[in-house]
């Protein structure tokens, strides 16, 4: 998901 902050906090998960 590049649209929002994910588990890693980068939003690349």
Curated annotation (Swiss-Prot):
Localization: Secreted
Supply the alphabetized keyword list.
Neuropeptide, Secreted
Tissue expression as described in the entry: Abdominal nerve cord and hindgut.
**Which protein are we looking at?**
Orcokinin
The terms describing its cellular component in GO are: extracellular region
User: Among its keywords, does the record have Phosphoprotein?
Assistant: no
- Superkingdom: Eukaryota
Where's it mainly located? secreted
GO terms for biological process?
A: neuropeptide signaling pathway
Q: What does this protein do?
A: Myotropic peptide, enhances both the frequency and amplitude of spontaneous hindgut contractions.
């Amino acid at each position: 998901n590049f649209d929002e902050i994910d588990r890693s906090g980068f939003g690349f998960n």
